[in-house]
Amino acid sequence: MTLKNLTDDVLIERLKKLVHEEREILMSVLHHLREVERRRLFSKYQCASLFAYAVTELKYSESQADRRISAMRLL
């Protein structure tokens, strides 16, 4: 079934559920990043910083890495 075939109500409900799941996953990612930084695990991967690790190993763009690390530091 494609999105085009969904009723408006079903589409909206699925979207809300996905956004909720996305928030939960993002919070888990941020907590994991914080623990990686606390343990300085990025150095095991020849990265000088969490930012370098996020870009090279996690394949985030520089702006994605910066946003996530900034959010992580607010926890």
Protein language model regions, located:
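Amphipathic alpha-helical "recognition" segments
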Residues: 47-75
